Amino acid sequence: VITNVHIEPAHRVKKRSIDQPLRISIFYDHSVYRLEATKFDLINNTILPEAVKFWEQALKVRKTGGPIRLNRKCPTRQVFIRGSRAHCIDSCKADTMCGEVKVPEHHLSPCYVCNSTGHDCRILSPAPAAERRADNDDNGNALNDYDAPPLSDEEDSTGVEDSDFVLYVSAVETERCRRGLTVAYASHCQQEAALDRPVAGHANFCPGELSTKYRDLPSVLATVKHEILHALGFSMSLFAFYRDENGEPLTERRPDTGNPPLDEELQIHKWSDRVVKNITRNKWMIRGGYVERSFNMVVTPRVVREVRQHFNCSELEGAELEDQGGDGTALTHWEKRLFENEAMTGTHTQNSVFSRLTFALMEDT
């Protein structure tokens, strides 16, 4: 995940008190067009339009004040922040990926670099236009829903106008697809610098598991809505970036990077107990007696208010997160035992709903 995408200074975004409906822009990878016609029509004409419309009507954000120009991928994890912009060391990677999709050149910022000591910071000149066109012609993973405008050597990228979130969509039978009965999965790939909000993400449809039967449509649509929300904010990889109602971080930031501390083993940023807290029950009743049991709860203000009201329990610390299912399920969904058919639990249940609890979490991001 790439952070510190520069769009506007933080003080400008914080002062913009009126939120606007979320605007999502969709870009297809070539793999989507290679699907059989019935599956392409399902995605293009029904599933994605309805899922995107649902979240655009349900969520509001501080309006993005200009085009989204995504950061280029650096060869290493180390970057320098200069003037609110991330700078790579000496060079940028030739390709910047978002999930299975190569981000188009005209969606990217220039290549900002510094030397290994953080000095001599500058914009690295792009490859000659002819070379870039040759690279694009050879790339089988580019987007082709419209032709990219030609870029001169000096011209800045156009970025993505009139949008708050860019969703790159692919349809590739990946290893993750083959692990189980996975219809689709999604995640964010870049966050803006001012408030850490995700501004780009990817969604991959698994062709082998994508059903076009009418009876399966509600299930597929619910799954895609669920996955898009992971990219928009409901994700353990974003917990450490949540902010309070004044736009201040809920997790302390490192002075050298401006980001929360990184868990090197899990490769995710560590959140504070103002976001997710480990709770221990000393007398957890089971058949035949009591045991000690620990679990993780979301303890942000609106979530606490909603979960206490839901269970009519004024002492409840927060909303419990799933503790089973391994990577991709545990800690990034609501606990199924408690929240049953809530759409953001880890397994699909008929008649799933997005409850006030999930919307409270999104408000607390």
For each of these PLM feature ranges, what is it?
Residues 1-222, 231-365:
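Extracellular zinc-dependent metalloprotease catalytic-domain scaffold
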Residues 226-227:
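Conserved beta-strand->loop/alpha-helix structural units within folded catalytic cores of enzymes
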